[in-house]
Amino acid sequence: AAKLVPAIRFVTSDTGIAAAKVSAMLEGTQHPIHIGSCIAVDHRHQSKVEDFEAALDQLFAQFGDSVARLQKLLDIHLSYPVNAMTRICKKLSLPKKAALEAIGMFEMAYGGGTATAHDVFMAMQEIPYILKSDHAPEGKMLVVEENMARALTLRWGDYDLAKAVSY
């Protein structure tokens, strides 16, 4: 297993949305794992360093929360992990082609047994890697990463159903 280390990403835009965004992630896999939502600091009205400090305080609180949620996924055992992954990808409106590719890779790797929600969440991290490999625009990548981070807040047992699901 890869050793994951905390990281922070700052994103600014000089067109459209006049805000800087800061988000928490874990690095150590082929593509960083986005955990938690982006926190925006409006910079239209000459934001000060203090505004960014407040955003970072909020980010660090959220980061601790998200890491705890990620750890809890280790305790959630899924009887039908492929079905759960498919339902969760669909619920999060993840790009179908990349999601189906990641689901197929997970299905081949795990071989039809049970898995933890953590295993499925980590398998879902192939999706941004696939999109990046296909040269998806940065804006789309940010939306997908934020949507994927929402998986940490879902009730995984609700998606662990025997009935097959189509995407």
Could you say what each language-model-derived stretch is?
Residues 3-167:
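Intrinsically disordered, low-complexity regions enriched in serine/threonine
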